[in-house]
Curated annotation (Swiss-Prot):
This is WD repeat-containing protein 74. It is found in: Nucleus, Nucleolus; Nucleus. The keyword tRNA-binding does not apply. Residues 323-384 are annotated as: Disordered. WD repeats lie at residues 40-80, 83-122, 128-168, 179-220, 224-266, 267-306. Keywords: Methylation, Nucleus, Phosphoprotein, Repeat, WD repeat. GO terms for biological process: blastocyst formation; ribosomal large subunit biogenesis; RNA metabolic process; rRNA processing. Residues 320-384 are annotated as: Required for nucleolar and nuclear location. One of its GO terms (cellular component) is nucleolus. Isoform 1 interacts (through WDR repeats) with NVL; the interaction is independent of RNA or pre-60S ribosome particles. Isoform 2 does not interact with NVL. Interacts with MTREX; the interaction dissociation in a late stage of rRNA synthesis is required for appropriate maturation of pre-60S particles and depends on the ATPase activity of NVL. It comes from Mus musculus.
Length: 384
């Protein structure tokens, strides 16, 4: 593993093959990190979050229901704990006041004592937030407050230090013009800075803003984009707009104050799985099923800044918030130990290229054969 330069990685990406990848954009270099040295699809990375000590530690949520603690400074896995309860994969991870917060597909949200990492330990708190959860998101200002949303599971806000009932429960929009119920499918949510408002994106290509302070529990603003389900969302550095991505790789910036489209970003070729903006720079990191990590500039001029192919399907990402991207010391690169699955992929492509070369005829030999055939023909003969 490349551990000496791990602290200078700009983006951390979780893959479907269970690999945590650290990407240095200045060097166009990606390092692979696995606790056992071999990738396993049973340990696919579904959720990532920073530890409470800044950006020195990463919490890695895997499909086998283990949460691994990764030292981002040294590039090593420190420990892990098993978090049972409910069914499905992690839909959100968070840390708050010495506790670990997990939430899974089936709607079981649990709070664990972080100091006790034994598998047999019981959770400090368990909440049933409803089935079909798509996302659990922590309030960055009040770390003990989280929001959950999902399919046929309306947006809810929970105070983990209060009662076991949500402090806010969103209400579905009114029936459509045929007086039919509108289905619920909230894919992602974000807390808006400087207020109690929340914004969600839906599987029916809508962006909605909710205000828990308002007397109504329905959205106070709604906008639509495209025709395909929205799968991921992130706030821009100014906090006045969001960037959403859909299942066809389309990215768009929407002003949630007026509900209008500000612009689009191009380049993706598959469903978007992860989006995150830099807190101070006009940069957006995106990843998805096309196995490519992209960094876009979201302010004039808009465009693609970096593009790194990472070989595996990408599920989630973390973008470093530091500002000194260009001022890093140039450390010697260590040889990267590529897991066996990536090595097999390279060998497969190499064999395909070799087979293609064997099938192509030699141009010189073909021309020589044609000339010999012409010389052997008798005078006055005509070609068929």
């Amino acid at each position: 593993m490349a551990t000496a330069s791990a602290r200078w990685n700009h983006v951390w990406v979780g893959t479907e093959t269970g690999i945590l990848k650290g990407v240095n954009l200045q060097r166009k270099h990606a390092a692979n990190f696995t606790p056992s040295g071999q990738p396993r699809r049973e340990e696919a990375v579904n959720a990532l979050c920073w530890g409470t000590g800044g950006e020195t530690q990463i919490l890695v949520g895997c499909a086998d229901r283990t949460v691994r603690y990764f030292n981002a400074e040294e590039g090593t896995f420190l420990s892990q704990r098993y978090c049972p309860g409910g069914e499905g994969t992690f839909r959100g991870l968070a840390q708050a006041d010495g506790t670990l917060i997990t939430c899974v597909d089936s709607g079981i949200l649990r709070v664990w004592c972080e100091n006790d990492k034994e598998a047999s330990s019981d959770p400090l708190l368990e909440l049933k937030v409803g089935p079909g959860v798509c996302r659990m998101r922590q309030d960055p200002t009040h770390t003990h407050v989280v929001a959950t949303c999902g399919k046929e599971n309306a947006l809810k806000v929970w105070d983990l230090q209060g009662s076991e009932e949500p402090v806010f429960r969103a209400k579905n929009v009114r029936n459509d013009w045929l007086d039919l119920r509108v289905p619920i499918w909230d894919q992602d949510t974000q807390f808006l800075p400087g207020s109690q408002k929340l914004v969600t994106c839906t599987g029916y290509h809508q962006v909605r803003v909710y205000d828990p302070v308002s007397p109504q529990r329905r959205p106070v603003l709604e906008a639509t984009y495209g025709e395909y389900p929205l799968t991921a969302m992130t706030l821009t550095p100014e906090g006045n707009s969001v960037i959403v991505g859909n299942t066809h790789g389309q990215l768009a910036e929407i002003d949630f104050r007026q509900g209008r489209l500000l612009g689009c970003l191009k380049g993706l070729a598959g469903s978007v799985r992860g989006l995150q903006c830099h807190p101070s720079k006009p940069l957006l990191a995106s990843c998805g099923l096309d196995r490519v990590l992209r960094i876009h500039r979201i302010r004039n001029p808009r465009g693609l800044e970096h593009k790194v192919y990472l070989k595996s399907q990408l599920n989630c990402l973390l973008l470093s918030g530091r500002d000194n991207w260009e001022d890093e010391p140039q450390e010697p690169q260590e040889p990267n130990q590529v897991p066996s699955e990536d090595t097999e992929t390279d060998e497969l492509w190499a064999s395909l290229e070799a087979a293609a070369k064997r099938k192509l005829p030699d141009l010189d030999q073909t021309q020589g054969a044609l000339q010999r055939r012409k010389k052997k023909k008798r005078p006055g003969s005509t070609s068929p």
